[in-house]
Amino acid sequence: MDALMNFGTGIFGGAWPAVWTLIKIVLIVAPMMLGVAYLTYFERKVIGYMQVRIGPNRVGPWGLIQPIADGLKLLMKEIIVPSGANKGIFIIAPMLAIAPALAAWAVVPFTDSLVLANIDASLLYIMAITSMGVYGIILSGWASNSKYAFLGAMRSAAQMVSYEISMGFSLICVLMVSNSLNLVEIVNVQNQGRFAGWGLSFLSWNWLPLFPMFLVYLISGVAETNRAPFDVAEGESEIVAGFHVEYSGMAFAVFFLAEYANMILVSALTSIMFLGGWLSPVSFLPDGILWLFAKMSAILFLFLWFRATFPRYRYDQLMRLGWKVFVPICLIWLVVVGVWMMSPLNIWK
């Protein structure tokens, strides 16, 4: 790494730090966008097997080129702006939806040294930036000049705000036990404790002592990304297709990409906050980025499994779950963790 920095400084001089930052951005965003594309392929394959079908198998070997074909098809489609729509906001809204999903990766650590911006308040940054995705959805529904799109946008806004509260309380618990807002520190703290000393690191991760918070965060993450069974914002049987009903071509594809990018982000954050990030589950295996990818893949599989298994919630059921079940659980467990930390049985010392 030092040789690379010296080489870059020799070529670019004082501009090298800015160039190096741009290179890191490309190295993170490009594979992530490719991962988003192939997550759609993985989803169709997994759900196909669950429904005793084959899934995509025509474009390329085993259908592996299907995501590229879908992207090219959408790229060649016309973006139709409805009459009566606010054209400027209609075009900008998809970009406002995907921008927070990409910007959040600036502080997501892949290892303790591989992170774009290792800032002390990275947890606060994540909570702030991810809450901005709802603006693109609200503006898309309003600018479309369609009752179905506007109704879907209002549903989505209420849903995302409701479940952000539960996710925020879950992360406050993580903050309490980690005593840090830095994501790298949050992972390193999970490698301490009695079980880690015995070589069973996975028992010292936050998922076990904060198990109710882990479940609340995971389920709220599914709701936050508008995925089944919480996809009332785009309920096909009720409001046609929700907030993006009037979109076509690449404008529609960007909303699609934003949804899957948010799925990957929630999987990464769940792995970092509760499952030890890049840490190995046992001491005799080395830590590394592959562990983080394995944990993310397992959580992404749960997203797909939920979609194939559960029917959609009614809107009132969804709101009741968020406000009358998750919020009380979070408040109770915050008190439990606080008392636990002040007691002689504190396991986070």
From Swiss-Prot:
Membrane-related topology note: Multi-pass membrane protein
HAMAP family for the chain: NDH1_NuoH
Lineage: Bacteria, Pseudomonadati, Pseudomonadota, Betaproteobacteria, Rhodocyclales
Full protein name: NADH-quinone oxidoreductase subunit H
PANTHER family: NADH DEHYDROGENASE SUBUNIT 1, NADH-UBIQUINONE OXIDOREDUCTASE CHAIN 1
Quaternary structure (record): NDH-1 is composed of 14 different subunits. Subunits NuoA, H, J, K, L, M, N constitute the membrane sector of the complex.
Location relative to the cell: Cell inner membrane
Catalytic activity: a quinone + NADH + 5 H(+)(in) = a quinol + NAD(+) + 4 H(+)(out)
One GO process term, biological-process aspect: aerobic respiration
Function: NDH-1 shuttles electrons from NADH, via FMN and iron-sulfur (Fe-S) centers, to quinones in the respiratory chain. The immediate electron acceptor for the enzyme in this species is believed to be ubiquinone. Couples the redox reaction to proton translocation (for every two electrons transferred, four hydrogen ions are translocated across the cytoplasmic membrane), and thus conserves the redox energy in a proton gradient. This subunit may bind ubiquinone.
A cellular component annotation (GO) from this entry: plasma membrane
Transmembrane regions listed in the UniProt entry: 20-42, 88-108, 123-143, 167-187, 202-222, 249-269, 284-304, 325-345
Tagged with keyword Nucleotidyltransferase: no
Pfam families assigned to the protein according to its UniProt record, in alphabetical order: NADHdh
Domain of life: Bacteria
InterPro entries linked to this entry: NADH_UbQ_OxRdtase_su1/FPO, NADH_UbQ_OxRdtase_su1_CS
Family under the similarity heading: Belongs to the complex I subunit 1 family.
Catalytic EC class: translocase
Alphabetical keyword list: Cell inner membrane, Cell membrane, Membrane, NAD, Quinone, Translocase, Transmembrane, Transmembrane helix, Ubiquinone
